[in-house]
From Swiss-Prot:
Cross-referenced HAMAP family: ATP_synth_gamma_bact (MF_00815)
Subunit text: F-type ATPases have 2 components, CF(1) - the catalytic core - and CF(0) - the membrane proton channel. CF(1) has five subunits: alpha(3), beta(3), gamma(1), delta(1), epsilon(1). CF(0) has three main subunits: a, b and c.
PANTHER family from the UniProt entry: ATP SYNTHASE GAMMA CHAIN, ATP SYNTHASE GAMMA CHAIN, CHLOROPLASTIC
Gene symbol of the encoding locus: atpG
Subcellular location: Cellular thylakoid membrane
A molecular function GO annotation: ATP binding
Job description of the protein: Produces ATP from ADP in the presence of a proton gradient across the membrane. The gamma chain is believed to be important in regulating ATPase activity and the flow of protons through the CF(0) complex.
Membrane topology: Peripheral membrane protein
Organism field: Synechococcus sp. (strain ATCC 27144 / PCC 6301 / SAUG 1402/1)
Protein name: ATP synthase gamma chain
Family: Belongs to the ATPase gamma chain family.
InterPro entries in UniProt: ATP_synth_F1_ATPase_gsu, ATP_synth_F1_gsu, ATP_synth_F1_gsu_CS
Sorted UniProt keywords: ATP synthesis, CF(1), Hydrogen ion transport, Ion transport, Membrane, Thylakoid, Transport
GO cellular component assignments: plasma membrane-derived thylakoid membrane; proton-transporting ATP synthase complex
Amino acid sequence: MANLKAIRDRIKSVRNTRKITEAMRLVAAAKVRRAQEQVLSTRPFADRLAQVLAGLQQRLQFENVDLPLLQRREVKTVALLVVSGDRGLCGGYNSNVIRRAEQRARELSAQGLDYKFVIVGRKAGQYFQRREQPIEATYSGLEQIPTAQEANDIADQLLSLFLSGTVDRVELVYTKFLSLVASNPVVQTLLPLDPQGLASSDDEIFRLTTRGGSFTVEREKLTSEVAPLPRDMIFEQDPAQILSALLPLYLSNQLLRALQEAAASELAARMTAMNSASDNANALVGQLTLVYNKARQAAITQELLEVVAGAEALNG
């Protein structure tokens, strides 16, 4: 009977764990939807900013203007901005982006370049601190759905490093959101800004929906027509000064989009991990229930045999 009680307690424990993992899966799904809504809400501003930048670029394309954020110089030191999470229970999300950052650092070292880390997320920060890697700044405790203010703070730090000459290039290592079961750590150059990429406004948006009782992601390719500014438009300020003032805003916007996509990747990884944990809990409950029934059947059979044996002994 003691063995039966232990099995019952184990079944109860697994069922309670399953309730927790299922709740975490649903919470992650709700936050993915919030991240999706935030991306859509910021899109009109991003489109308008791209339109203005494209127009200013066209206006200044034949002029020799000095814009530090577009200036390319000899690269000696690279800042690696690594975006990870603050928490675990999200499968291989954190380990994959950390592995990609380490790989990029080795590539830079092989080229004879120095590197410094700027870390977003407690997991990557703890990892690189333990290995005594050169860390310029760390950011943790950010909102699970990144805000514009957080992106601005990080962008200001990157601008300071680049404009002061501390680093000659800034690269972003983050997880690109592909689907609920797939993500891809990528490396993207943030600074210097690419003049050819400022007018690019092609984008993909994702929508988390339910189909057949399970979650799925629908992706939609969006292409915004960037209308040129009127040729007779008169600027109160020098167009070069306006462009110089808008470029940091463009950087912050690009960084915010990357943070949002990384957050969606983390939440999707957590959804997948918790879904897998719930499935494993269901399978374990089934196995334990079978073991319990067999043990209970064996105990009942043993009791019957003892009763029969006792009756035969009395009759004999």
